[in-house]
């Protein structure tokens, strides 16, 4: 990496050692520039890896004494043939009026670092030995075990899936193949002989596990849905005809081989359905205690052959017996207590205390021990799955970040009972609606990709949004003669046009050009004037979004109206700053002149008015200043730009028919909206601990997404699985635990395994 000096205002990039690069599931390259600690950098015994430190400083101030904000940039993926790439970022900061100049626009150019190759996950012989072995026999497994090798089992983590998808993408790109299914399902063994070994790089799992994972990901027949009665009958006939030839049976039914194998294993002609009778429950308890040599009242969660139990019970399948026992009957007989909200919070805290990097490392048996309200370790894990779904993007964040987000979410709910009451009531329009949530990311495209828009470098910022649909009949109509968009009251902090925009310096100090996807330029001038005007025509797009952040001080201490008048479909985002943000302008007005005519819109627009705001809204813990001055510049320089957003909510009326709202929206829409905005427990977190550092927005799921109580009954939804890797269970002869519904082939499934042996 080198220093770039094109202009006098170009920021110098100093390299301590190297830059951290990772890739997400979308194949985007993530560049992380962490905050530097001078003492840590100069310390000889620092344990921080050198590739996680990067210093950014301006040319006129080479010191790193001042705090430098952490920056996470997501760029387009690198081609394997690229020797270098360029990242150009346009950024603005809050500065005093006399300091506002073109120098506030920062341009950073970063070259590809040769040390990237040294950061390959293939650095250890142990990982390579495991990921290059098929493990189709017990001897293969024992051989590597005796050599001291260990490997990961159980559920796949987000990081592992990211590595796998990235490896597949690179393999396809290197060979000019567009779809991985061509390799997986169409190529011969010889043609794809290096495929699985290549995509297993960096994964501490055997090739057989990678093979099974890839098949389930790419085989559309594995996600067909519930078996119909007709399919069940056909499956029985095919099983008699073809035996254990699961591939042939699956092809005849249009389903995957693993799917039909699992269904056959659970299929019995004598199974009852519906509620269990007292006689069935009694029989189940007797059989379990008899087979495990335990007494009634003893807790039994492991070492049970559910196939043997089902055979002895006679009227239920092994899945039904297992679910009934682990979810209810064993807990009831042992005198267990009901699960409460306090237990839910306690579970989060206990998992946090474990300090594990991946949830697959949790010992659920140990965690459930002595917990009277926990019905079984398996039940506790399923409860955890329910809890983590409170975070809408839980699949996209690392486990430590997820835990921290859940802790903060429950802390916010605990400290804001009024918000919880409002969310659960019928007066909030978004209490049962679906949301569209994305990460907070800065996506930076290469210069050559933006030539059609502008020859100058620019950055496209994508904002995460939570959408609530509002009917046009619920708001009073505005004047049909209005052709402007006016937002009065509060401090104007941001203005965005989605789905994307480009911010380009115009050459005039303090003035930037908002370049939209429709190639319409909207010059934006940052001044101390109470009015900030966007000249020229606003884009006549139904996806136009105005972002207006209202000052918490203003919302809590004034009764002025907030009026929105426009002829385009209404999409308004209201945001509230975090506790470290002060009010830069006491009063601001945004006016956008439009070319649109009222004749283009047959229906009149709405006006959203709020005369007062509820007194019970808790005052944010923040220092409010009436105006911005030079004394506060340091406050802004210390903050990560993504932390300026505390809550984001978008309200539209175009897709009301698609919502699942069961109640009538309140008449005072604005009051309800502002209450929701002020207390939305959206969390922005900057990760520093791992190589996969990135800035992440954790967004709580809508209130209606997760039921307050599970209402677990006889037919629980607990998945049929165990706490060990199902792929290797058939090798463990000493275990009587039945595998999961994802069960691996047993020894007689010769066709499934023999195909694998010949792949290498």
UniProtKB/Swiss-Prot annotation:
<keyword id="KW-0804">Transcription</keyword>
<feature type="region of interest" description="Required for transcriptional activation">
    <location>
        <begin position="459"/>
        <end position="760"/>
    </location>
</feature>
<feature type="region of interest" description="Required for transcriptional activation">
    <location>
        <begin position="87"/>
        <end position="170"/>
    </location>
</feature>
<feature type="region of interest" description="Disordered">
    <location>
        <begin position="24"/>
        <end position="63"/>
    </location>
</feature>
<comment type="function">
    <text>Transcriptional activator which activates the CDKN2A/ARF locus in response to Ras-Raf signaling, thereby promoting p53/TP53-dependent growth arrest. Binds to the consensus sequence 5'-CCCG[GT]ATGT-3'.</text>
</comment>
<keyword id="KW-0597">Phosphoprotein</keyword>
<feature type="domain" description="HTH myb-type">
    <location>
        <begin position="268"/>
        <end position="333"/>
    </location>
</feature>
<dbReference type="GO" id="GO:0000981">
    <property type="term" value="F:DNA-binding transcription factor activity, RNA polymerase II-specific"/>
</dbReference>
<dbReference type="GO" id="GO:0006357">
    <property type="term" value="P:regulation of transcription by RNA polymerase II"/>
</dbReference>
<dbReference type="Pfam" id="PF20588">
    <property type="entry name" value="DMTF1_N"/>
</dbReference>
<dbReference type="InterPro" id="IPR017930">
    <property type="entry name" value="Myb_dom"/>
</dbReference>
<keyword id="KW-0010">Activator</keyword>
<protein>
    <recommendedName>
        <fullName>Cyclin-D-binding Myb-like transcription factor 1</fullName>
    </recommendedName>
</protein>
<dbReference type="GO" id="GO:0000978">
    <property type="term" value="F:RNA polymerase II cis-regulatory region sequence-specific DNA binding"/>
</dbReference>
<dbReference type="InterPro" id="IPR001005">
    <property type="entry name" value="SANT/Myb"/>
</dbReference>
<comment type="subunit">
    <text>Interacts with the D-type cyclins CCND1, CCND2 and CCND3. Interaction with D-type cyclins may modulate transcriptional activation by this protein.</text>
</comment>
<feature type="region of interest" description="Required for DNA-binding">
    <location>
        <begin position="87"/>
        <end position="458"/>
    </location>
</feature>
<feature type="DNA-binding region" description="H-T-H motif">
    <location>
        <begin position="306"/>
        <end position="329"/>
    </location>
</feature>
<feature type="domain" description="Myb-like 2">
    <location>
        <begin position="339"/>
        <end position="388"/>
    </location>
</feature>
<dbReference type="InterPro" id="IPR046775">
    <property type="entry name" value="DMTF1_N"/>
</dbReference>
<dbReference type="InterPro" id="IPR009057">
    <property type="entry name" value="Homeodomain-like_sf"/>
</dbReference>
<dbReference type="GO" id="GO:0045944">
    <property type="term" value="P:positive regulation of transcription by RNA polymerase II"/>
</dbReference>
<feature type="region of interest" description="Disordered">
    <location>
        <begin position="738"/>
        <end position="760"/>
    </location>
</feature>
<feature type="region of interest" description="Interaction with CCND1, CCND2 and CCND3">
    <location>
        <begin position="176"/>
        <end position="690"/>
    </location>
</feature>
<dbReference type="GO" id="GO:0001228">
    <property type="term" value="F:DNA-binding transcription activator activity, RNA polymerase II-specific"/>
</dbReference>
<keyword id="KW-0805">Transcription regulation</keyword>
<comment type="similarity">
    <text>Belongs to the DMTF1 family.</text>
</comment>
<feature type="compositionally biased region" description="Acidic residues">
    <location>
        <begin position="37"/>
        <end position="47"/>
    </location>
</feature>
<keyword id="KW-0539">Nucleus</keyword>
<feature type="region of interest" description="Interaction with CCND2">
    <location>
        <begin position="1"/>
        <end position="237"/>
    </location>
</feature>
<keyword id="KW-0677">Repeat</keyword>
<dbReference type="Pfam" id="PF00249">
    <property type="entry name" value="Myb_DNA-binding"/>
</dbReference>
<dbReference type="GO" id="GO:0005634">
    <property type="term" value="C:nucleus"/>
</dbReference>
<feature type="region of interest" description="Disordered">
    <location>
        <begin position="593"/>
        <end position="614"/>
    </location>
</feature>
<keyword id="KW-0043">Tumor suppressor</keyword>
<dbReference type="InterPro" id="IPR051651">
    <property type="entry name" value="DMTF1_DNA-bind_reg"/>
</dbReference>
<keyword id="KW-0238">DNA-binding</keyword>
<feature type="domain" description="Myb-like 1">
    <location>
        <begin position="225"/>
        <end position="263"/>
    </location>
</feature>
<keyword id="KW-0131">Cell cycle</keyword>
């Amino acid at each position: 990496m080198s220093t770039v000096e094109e202009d006098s205002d170009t920021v110098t990039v100093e390299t301590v050692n190297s830059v951290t690069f990772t890739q997400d599931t979308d194949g985007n390259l993530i560049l992380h520039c962490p905050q530097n600690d001078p003492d840590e950098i100069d310390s000889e015994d620092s344990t921080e890896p050198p590739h996680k430190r990067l210093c950014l400083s301006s040319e006129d101030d080479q010191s790193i004494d001042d705090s430098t904000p952490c920056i996470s940039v997501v760029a387009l993926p690198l081609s394997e043939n690229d020797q270098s790439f360029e990242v150009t970022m346009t950024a603005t900061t809050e500065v005093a009026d006399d300091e506002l100049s073109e120098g506030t626009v920062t341009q950073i150019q970063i070259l590809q670092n040769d040390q990237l190759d040294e950061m390959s996950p293939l650095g250890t012989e142990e990982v390579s030995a495991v990921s290059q072995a098929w493990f189709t026999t017990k001897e293969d497994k024992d051989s590597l075990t005796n050599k001291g090798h260990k490997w990961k089992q159980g559920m796949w983590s987000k990081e592992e899936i990211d590595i796998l998808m990235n490896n597949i993408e690179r393999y396809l790109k290197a060979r000019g193949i567009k779809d991985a299914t061509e390799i997986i399902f169409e190529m011969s063994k010889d043609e794809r002989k290096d495929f699985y070994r290549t995509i297993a790089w960096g994964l501490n799992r055997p090739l057989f596990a990678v093979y099974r994972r890839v098949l389930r990901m790419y085989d559309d027949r594995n996600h067909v849905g519930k078996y119909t009665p007709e399919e069940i009958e056909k499956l029985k006939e095919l099983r008699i005809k073809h035996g254990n030839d699961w591939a042939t049976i699956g092809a005849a039914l249009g389903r995957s081989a693993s799917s039909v194998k699992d269904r056959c294993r659970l299929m019995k002609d004598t199974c009852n359905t519906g509620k269990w009778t007292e006689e069935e429950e009694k029989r189940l308890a007797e059989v379990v205690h008899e087979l495990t040599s335990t007494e009634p009242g003893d807790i039994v969660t492991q070492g049970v052959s559910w196939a043997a139990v089902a055979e002895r019970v006679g009227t239920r399948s092994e899945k039904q017996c297992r679910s009934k026992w682990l979810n209810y009957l064993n807990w009831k007989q042992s005198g267990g207590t009901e699960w409460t909200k306090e237990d839910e919070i306690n579970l989060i805290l206990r998992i946090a205390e474990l300090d594990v990097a991946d949830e697959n490392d949790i010992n659920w048996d140990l965690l459930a021990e002595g917990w009277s309200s926990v019905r079984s370790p398996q039940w506790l894990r399923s409860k955890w799955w329910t809890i983590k779904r409170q975070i809408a993007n839980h699949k996209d964040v690392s486990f430590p970040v997820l835990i921290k987000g859940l802790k903060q979410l429950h802390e916010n709910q605990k400290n804001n009972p009024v918000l919880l009451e409002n969310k659960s009531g019928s007066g909030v329009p978004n209490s049962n609606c679906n949301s569209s949530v994305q990460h907070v990311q800065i996506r930076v495209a290469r210069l050559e990709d933006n030539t059609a828009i502008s020859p100058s470098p620019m950055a496209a910022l994508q904002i995460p949004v939570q959408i609530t649909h509002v009917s046009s009949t619920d708001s009073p109509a505005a004047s049909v003669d209005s052709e402007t968009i006016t937002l009065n009251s509060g401090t104007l902090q941001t203005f965005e046009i989605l789905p994307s925009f480009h911010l380009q310096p115009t050459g005039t100090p303090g003035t930037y050009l908002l370049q939209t996807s429709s190639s319409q330029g909207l010059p934006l001038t940052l001044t101390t004037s109470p009015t900030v005007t966007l000249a020229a025509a606003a884009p006549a797009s139904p996806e136009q979004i105005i972002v207006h952040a209202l000052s918490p001080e203003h919302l809590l201490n004034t009764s002025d109206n907030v009026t929105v008048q426009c002829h385009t479909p209404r999409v308004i985002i209201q945001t509230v700053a975090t506790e470290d943000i002060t009010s830069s302008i006491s009063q601001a007005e945004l006016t956008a002149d439009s070319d649109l005519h009222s004749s283009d819109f047959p229906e009149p627009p709405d006006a959203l008015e709020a005369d007062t705001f509820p007194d019970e809204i808790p005052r944010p813990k923040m220092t409010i200043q009436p105006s911005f001055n030079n004394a506060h510049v340091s406050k802004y320089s210390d903050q990560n730009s993504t932390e300026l957003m505390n809550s984001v909510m978008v309200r539209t009326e175009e897709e009301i028919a698609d919502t699942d709202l069961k109640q009538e929206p309140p008449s005072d829409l604005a009051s309800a909206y502002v209450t929701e905005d002020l207390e939305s427990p959206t969390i922005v977190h900057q990760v520093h601990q791992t190589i996969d550092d990135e800035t992440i927005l954790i967004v709580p799921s809508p209130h209606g997404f997760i039921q307050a109580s599970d209402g677990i009954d006889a037919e629980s939804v607990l998945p049929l699985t165990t706490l060990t890797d199902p792929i290797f269970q058939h090798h463990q002869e000493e275990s009587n635990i039945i595998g999961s519904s994802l069960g691996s082939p047993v020894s007689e499934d010769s066709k499934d395994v023999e195909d694998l042996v010949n792949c290498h």
